[in-house]
A protein has these predicted regions:
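Hydrophobic structural segments
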Residues: 1-159
């Protein structure tokens, strides 16, 4: 299930966090809008460097990478939240790496075997940026209200 914000905001926000250029919709839903974005990374880098870049941009302690760490990547697809359903559209778009969350073992291995790397930042790893974005929007639209946010917490523990 996707929300209106998934179609009209989340992917653009995430693509902006990665400084993607020449962006396009990954999977069109309606009238040129849709889920995910593709684009050019700010520079060509190794997959390992891209993983570090994603960690830094989204303030993450770790990411899971499928693919050869020394592979050079220049283009990316980003699909915040669960990205398993975006594997085929990303592959068909011909990008070097899919950046998403909730990529299962077999999908990640299959994509890497097909030549497309995957960076799994976790379901909430990318989507947590929604909170601050929505807070700013509400503060602008409703200046008389004090907008408070809850701290971001993963719904599980990694030990």
């Amino acid at each position: 299930m996707h929300t209106n914000y998934d179609v009209l905001g989340m992917a653009d926000l995430a693509a902006g966090m990665l400084d993607l250029t020449e962006t396009e919709v990954l999977e069109e839903v309606l009238d040129g809008e849709g889920i995910g974005r593709t684009g050019r990374l700010p520079k060509i880098m190794t997959l390992e460097e891209c993983g570090q870049f994603v960690k830094e941009r989204f303030s993450l302690p770790n990411v899971k990478i499928f693919g050869e760490l020394n592979k050079m990547v220049a283009t990316a697809a980003i699909s915040p939240g669960s990205g398993k359903s975006m594997a085929r559209p990303a592959f068909e778009a011909g990008v070097d790496v899919l950046i998403s969350g909730d990529i299962d073992h077999h999908t990640g291995i299959d994509m890497a075997d097909c030549g497309m790397a995957v960076i799994d930042a976790g379901h909430y790893g990318i989507e947590h940026i929604y909170i601050e974005d929505m807070k700013k929007f509400l503060e602008k639209e409703l200046p008389a209200l004090k907008i408070c946010t809850a701290p971001v917490r993963q719904p599980f523990q990694v030990i």
